[in-house]
A protein has these predicted regions:
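Conserved two-lobed SF2 helicase motor
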Residues: 87-92, 199, 203-204, 417-426
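Conserved beta-strand -> loop -> alpha-helix junction used to position metal-binding or nucleic-acid-contacting
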Residues: 84-97, 116, 382-397
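Conserved helicase NTPase motor core
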Residues: 5, 10-21, 25-30, 60, ...
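Helicase P-loop NTPase motor core
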Residues: 29, 35-41, 281-284, 290-384, ...
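Conserved helicase C-terminal RecA-like lobe
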Residues: 370-387, 393-499
Length: 499
């Protein structure tokens, strides 16, 4: 039995209800961390369909990750509208559209999706340069090619962009050398009749711009569009969105400028902040700042991180809807190993008191911080899993699966690897945990690298904010006074974000 309109709205706060009932676009929703963003968006879609304001078959919601799209579909299913509403990532939505229109516009078969772009980058590099080929170089070149594509920068434009913005090509290449690699990569794909994931979006844009029949066919299935995580939209994704819409203005965007943490990969909050100028007048412009996830102590800590920004006044100030919790713990350790041991011991104490290891997370700024944590957790006989940008990697002290399982069994841990999460801050986005331990809060780690100012520093501030707001019940923030390296011990300074 389908839920009634009023049942769909039941349990929403005033701001969430106002957003859910604003079914005519354009609508902007600024949703802070823990403010019930997905709940509000899915209720809005369900409410519009239940009241017959929208046709579910012409309704599409797009987001950035497979996990987020699956969560949206799951929630819509419980509201009896998932069968007809399309909830997908940008790339899966565009790929579906491309497959639908390809037979009508092209005689030959559709190109294959490149399964190993890294191999193509390596072949391209070897073909055009004598540069040393290693994993870091290949990874950096692949990332730069991706950045060019989502930033709508062609090989012909690259050198000019570098000169205008002082951008340095990766791995010590000159702009002209990178352009040669970029062109060779494109040629290699063409020779293989392959396209990469960014090409999918580029081709759909091109077809819609060059063929009005194609544009009309695609737009006929998108009368109402919802875009999640709009603060992370790239120029390429923005271009695709505008092609999907045409003259239609039934669009709702949802995002949070304070959670823009992928600028290095081409994302920008500009489209979110400039939405009213581009699509206005807006029918609704709503802020969701009631945090249902974190305690007041954690929320206040997060607010202080953002309030110290010297250049941004557009961040939402969160207000916790939870009862008072434990104060945020700030701990200073003597060394990285002492920090890892101390955090592992605290988690061991939580688990011994009845908490689940899966409710605990250790957040790091970079992957390199994670190995020592694995060792410390192993010594405490704690299960763990490591999350990098590419996803989950169940890990222990050995990379061999059988050895790893045998080791866990010998420690009395067992083969169930659903344990403590060790994650980079970037990879933790969209997740939440009862107990969060944020380590390495020193200058050079967060903020990362040499002292920076302006937007680079601001992105590091937002990273700190994202890390803090992953915590539900408790937050432990720490740093180590010294680090050990090839040159012996070196002193560290506490992070400017260590509040």
């Amino acid at each position: 039995m389908s839920a009634t309109a009023e049942e769909i709205l039941d349990g929403l706060d005033d701001a969430q209800r106002a957003a859910a009932m604003a079914v005519d676009g354009p609508v902007r929703i600024i949703a802070g961390a823990g403010a019930g963003k997905t709940r509000t968006v899915t209720r809005r879609i369900a409410y519009a369909c239940a009241t017959k304001a929208w046709n579910p078959r012409s309704t599409m919601a797009v987001t950035f990750s497979v996990k987020a799209a699956a969560e949206m579909r799951s929630r819509l299913s419980k509201l009896d509208v998932a069968a007809d509403v399309k909830a997908a990532t940008f790339h899966s939505a565009a790929l579906h559209q491309l497959r639908q229109v390809w037979p009508d516009v092209c005689e030959g078969p559709m190109p294959f999706i490149c399964r190993n772009p890294r191999e193509l980058v390596e072949r391209s590099l070897r073909r055009v340069t004598t540069f040393q080929v290693d994993d870091d170089t290949i990874r950096n070149l692949q990332a730069e090619i991706n950045w060019c594509k989502i930033s709508l920068i062609t090989p012909e434009d690259y050198a000019r962009v570098c000169a205008a913005t002082h951008r340095q090509p990766p791995s010590g290449l000159e702009p002209s050398q990178f352009v040669d690699v970029y062109k060779a990569y494109e040629a290699e794909k063409t020779n293989r009749n392959e396209i990469d994931f960014d090409d999918i979006l580029l081709i759909v844009c091109h077809l819609m711009e060059s063929d009005e029949d194609v544009a009309s066919a695609i737009r006929s299935n998108i009368a109402w569009l919802t875009v999640d995580e709009y603060q992370d939209v790239s120029p390429l994704q923005h271009r695709l969105l505008t092609r999907w819409l045409g003259s239609n203005r039934n669009i709702c965007v949802v995002g949070d400028p304070a959670q823009t943490i992928y600028s290095f990969a081409g994302a920008s909050s500009y489209s979110l902040l400039n939405f009213a100028s581009e699509f206005g007048p807006l029918t609704a412009d709503i802020n969701l700042n009631n945090d249902y996830r974190s305690t007041p102590q954690i929320v206040n800590y997060a607010n202080r991180v953002l309030a110290a920004s010297p250049q941004r006044a557009d961040y939402l100030k969160l207000s916790s809807e939870r009862s008072k919790g434990r104060r945020v713990a700030e701990t200073i350790y003597g060394s990285d190993w002492e920090e890892a041991q101390g955090v592992a011991a605290r988690i061991r104490k939580l688990v011994d008191a009845g908490e689940s290891p899966a409710d605990c997370a250790i957040l790091t700024r970079v992957n390199a911080q994670q190995k020592i944590l694995c060792k410390a957790l192993g010594e405490q006989h704690l299960r763990y899993r490591v999350r990098r940008d590419s996803g989950w990697q169940n890990s222990a002290l050995s990379d061999d699966a059988q050895t790893r399982l045998a080791m866990l069994e010998a420690l009395g841990v067992g083969a169930d690897l659903s344990g403590v999460t060790i994650s980079t801050i970037h990879a933790s986005k969209g997740l939440e945990f009862k107990h969060v331990f944020l380590i390495g809060c020193s200058e050079g780690l967060i903020p990362y690298g040499a002292p920076q100012e302006g937007e680079v520093l601001e992105e590091e501030r937002r990273l700190m904010y994202v890390a803090v707001t992953r915590a539900e019940d408790t937050l432990d923030v720490s740093y180590a006074r010294t680090r050990e390296g090839n040159e012996g011990e070196r002193a560290r300074r506490v992070s400017r974000f260590f509040r």
